[in-house]
Amino acid sequence: MDPAMPLQLWNLPLLLVGSVLGLTSVSAQGNNLEICLLPLDAGPCQALIPKFYYDRDQQKCRRFNYGGCLGNANNFHSRDLCQQTCGSIEKVPPVCRSELKTYPCDKPNIRFFFNLNTMTCEPLRPGLCSRTINVFSEEATCKGLCEPRKHIPSFCSSPKDEGLCSANVTRFYFNSRNKTCETFTYTGCGGNENNFYYLDACHRACVKGWKKPKRWKIGDFLPRFWKHLS
């Protein structure tokens, strides 16, 4: 390091790298779930840049100090941007978010756990057991408690996209955070499939799917669940 060069200039490349990483996380709209479930990673450098990340355990966006280099894509310039990218991820009960810890065993019976990365219930590999609460003796129990109730087309979760042109056309889109259809101004070209001519069409495609029976409550299966842990 040149002693004559101010410390701020040495930190400048770190700030630039941090900005690039932040932009990368924002542009990856197609992989929101993968990005948002990445663990907090402030990076190895020493800058203190205020950023936001999605906390998969608390299921909300939280502030952290980014070091300025490396890290991962779960790194947003603002809370609003974090919410736009990750806020529509389906919430699941705390029991389903518990980290899976396994150990070798010779029990032949199949058990199931909720994989937060895939948002599905999956069988434990043969020869593995677990005492964590995110393990269920029956697949139906796991699915009933943990798996998101999604009965709507995937495009209903797409963000509002006004398009690329300059027209001013009133359209409707499904706001996945509020679970309602709302108006927006469409510019006439580009955009995505979350774009409806009529409010009723948006409602039929995206709103009705959310009005299904509620997910099971933990009390519905707790005695049987604890029995299999003993």
From Swiss-Prot:
Gene3D superfamilies: Pancreatic trypsin inhibitor Kunitz domain. Residues 1-22 form the signal peptide. Glycans are attached at residues 168, 178. It comes from the Eukaryota. Highly expressed in placenta. Also expressed in liver and kidney. The keyword Nucleotide-binding does not apply. It is found in: Secreted. The record marks 46-47, 106-107, 166-167 as: Reactive bond. One of its GO terms (biological process) is blood coagulation. Disulfide bonds join 36-86, 45-69, 61-82, 96-146, 105-129, 121-142, 156-206, 165-189, 181-202. Its main location: secreted. InterPro entries: Kunitz_BPTI (IPR002223), Kunitz_BPTI_sf (IPR036880), Prtase_inh_Kunz-CS (IPR020901), TFPI-like (IPR008296), TFPI/VKTCI-like (IPR050098). Residues 36-86, 96-146, 156-206 form the BPTI/Kunitz inhibitor domain. One of its GO terms (cellular component) is extracellular region. It holds the Pfam family Kunitz_BPTI. Keywords: Blood coagulation, Disulfide bond, Glycoprotein, Hemostasis, Protease inhibitor, Repeat, Secreted, Serine protease inhibitor, Signal. May play a role in the regulation of plasmin-mediated matrix remodeling. Inhibits trypsin, plasmin, factor VIIa/tissue factor and weakly factor Xa. Has no effect on thrombin. Finds in a complex with ABCB1, TFPI2 and PPP2R3C; leading to the dephosphorylation of ABCB1. PANTHER family: KUNITZ-TYPE PROTEASE INHIBITOR-RELATED. This inhibitor contains three inhibitory domains. This is Tissue factor pathway inhibitor 2. It comes from Mus musculus (Mouse).
